[in-house]
């Protein structure tokens, strides 16, 4: 009896000791594990989640929402689902579902809704290309008997749909702001003479290119407004394509009425041009300090991509704070390693410029012939 109790006690002590040793061993292994890998950046996780959610959402394969989440009361437009099976939807579209659903909520094979402002809101938020495909674009009820034969002729107001704009005529636009580019009498003399050291008249630019034995045939005007730069260059047998956004006024339609080519694309989009085919890229007022620095860097290097060797980059009245030009934008521009043909900086003397210490920069830079 005493022997049996002693044996049981010994077994109990051995079992407890074994468990203690096992716990110690496990805890030491946990502590000796290698350090965890660095976390994935939040912005990258967000982009990956956005892309995954877009694919799942548009193909009805998304996992069930957690119990605490409220179910969406907005149904997905059927044409959006159809498009998603054929082409990828830009991931930024998912970040603006209300705008996207409003834009895609139309009746196929009928007239497109009058919602150009919704389309531009999506484009400016990175939702591009837009997915709407199967409706008929609207046209004016009364068509003008003739269209302008020269890019500086009077523009026929009946050739446009004005319902999306506050102003309902070109005269209204010209009176509200003569510098918007809708007064052809004013535009006819633009880019032709000096008003300050920041200006580079087109005749002088053509002479500069001839003296350096450069040929200018094809160009892109980024943020070109109503296309006046393209119109003036057309008189020198240079083909210029103008990128523009409407933003409350019929810029794209006006470019087309003048017999020129408008591209309705935002600044953040990759330029829809093949590599190394352009002789000139001009950046107008739309390219300025309000563009995020990273986007500006992408834009400059995309311009380098489409320019041929020996082609020109023309920054026309780029404005920023003087300190930012010295510390941020000038070093950014010099990354291209282009030859400096013109570099002029002057104070921006309007109220905003004086208040913020802003300056204008006009630069003409030439891409190296080879690299």
Segments and roles (model prediction):
Residues 226-238:
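Conserved SAM-binding loop of SAM-dependent methyltransferases across substrates and taxa
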Residues 293-310, 330:
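A short glycine-rich, Lys/Arg-flanked "PGG" loop and its adjoining helix->strand segment in the class I
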Residues 213-225, 314-337:
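Conserved class I S-adenosyl-L-methionine
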Residues 334-371:
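Core SAM-dependent methyltransferase catalytic element
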Residues 252-270, 274-275:
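S-adenosyl-L-methionine
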Residues 2-208, 362-364, 369-371:
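N-terminal accessory regions of S-adenosyl-L-methionine
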């Amino acid at each position: 009896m005493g022997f049996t109790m002693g044996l049981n006690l010994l077994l109990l002590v051995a079992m407890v000791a074994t468990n203690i040793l096992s716990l110690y061993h496990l805890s030491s292994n946990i502590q000796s594990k290698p350090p965890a890998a660095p976390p994935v950046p939040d912005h990258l996780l967000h982009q990956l989640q956005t892309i995954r959610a877009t694919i799942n959402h548009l193909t009805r394969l998304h996992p069930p929402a957690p119990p605490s989440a409220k179910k969406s009361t907005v149904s997905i437009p059927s044409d959006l689902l159809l498009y998603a099976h054929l082409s990828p939807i830009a991931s930024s579209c998912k970040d603006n579902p209300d705008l996207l659903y409003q834009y895609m909520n139309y009746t196929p094979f009928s007239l497109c809704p009058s919602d150009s402002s919704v389309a531009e809101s999506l484009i400016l938020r990175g939702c591009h290309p837009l997915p709407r495909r199967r409706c008929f674009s609207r046209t004016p009820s009364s068509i003008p008997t003739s269209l302008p034969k020269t890019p500086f002729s009077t523009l026929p107001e009946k050739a446009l749909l004005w319902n999306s704009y506050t102003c309902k005529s070109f005269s209204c636009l010209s009176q509200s702001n003569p510098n918007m580019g809708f007064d052809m009498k004013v535009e006819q003399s633009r880019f032709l003479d000096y008003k300050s050291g920041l200006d580079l008249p087109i005749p002088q630019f053509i002479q500069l290119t001839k003296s350096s034995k450069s040929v200018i045939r094809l160009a892109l005007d980024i943020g070109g407004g109503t296309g006046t730069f393209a119109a003036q260059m057309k008189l020198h047998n240079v083909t210029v394509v103008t990128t523009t956004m409407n933003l409350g006024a019929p810029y794209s339609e006006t470019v087309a009425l003048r017999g020129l080519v408008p591209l309705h694309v935002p600044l953040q989009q990759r330029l829809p041009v093949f590599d190394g085919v352009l002789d000139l890229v001009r950046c107008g007022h739309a390219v300025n300090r309000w563009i995020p620095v990273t986007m500006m860097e992408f834009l400059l290097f995309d311009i380098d991509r489409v320019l041929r060797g020996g082609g020109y980059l023309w920054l026309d009245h780029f404005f920023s704070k003087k300190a930012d030009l010295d510390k941020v934008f000038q070093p950014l521009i010099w990354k291209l390693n282009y030859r400096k043909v013109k570099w002029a900086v002057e104070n921006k003397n309007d109220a905003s410029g004086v208040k913020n210490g802003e300056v204008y920069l006009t630069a003409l830079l030439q891409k190296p012939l080879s690299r």
